[in-house]
Amino acid sequence: MTHSVQLKILDKRLGSEFPLPAYATKGSAGLDLRACLDEPLKIEPDETCLISTGLAIYLGHSNVAATILPRSGLGHKHGIVLGNLVGLIDSDYQGPLMVSCWNRGKEPYTINPGDRIAQLVVLPILKAQFAVVEEFELTERGAGGFGSSGQN
């Protein structure tokens, strides 16, 4: 299934010096987002930086949203994750896409212009309609919370 997304290029290096967002493989769920920086950016341990992706998107339909997610290799190997953990892009947002990068590692890390820093995933959205009730239908789990379903 595909969904047409309008993309506005805000940094003219995208599409020439830096590739446009693309799926790395046929099975990829996320499109790589790149750092549109003018020079390398060193992120010290425990520091966060807001980095431009050089683009804006318009999803155009209320039944979709996009998420900005971390790249697993950056987090696992270098401690670079998203400062807000997950970025949510609403269907009617049209502004620039920015990535909050947080160095939770013990060493400084340098992001270079054009580096892949996050991934964008477009998702279908179901709108909730609440039905107020006095009691829920009983389930096996019930109100069991954290850890109540066991470890294995």
Curated annotation (Swiss-Prot):
Q: Which GO terms describe its molecular function?
A: dUTP diphosphatase activity; magnesium ion binding
Superkingdom in the source lineage: Bacteria
Q: What is a biological process (GO) this protein takes part in?
A: dUTP catabolic process
Report the pathway entry.
Answer: Pyrimidine metabolism; dUMP biosynthesis; dUMP from dCTP (dUTP route): step 2/2
Q: What class of enzyme is it?
A: hydrolase
Keyword Metal-binding among UniProt keywords: yes
| Job description of the protein | This enzyme is involved in nucleotide metabolism: it produces dUMP, the immediate precursor of thymidine nucleotides and it decreases the intracellular concentration of dUTP so that uracil cannot be incorporated into DNA.
The family annotation for this protein states: Belongs to the dUTPase family.
What name is this protein filed under? Answer: Deoxyuridine 5'-triphosphate nucleotidohydrolase
The gene designation is dut
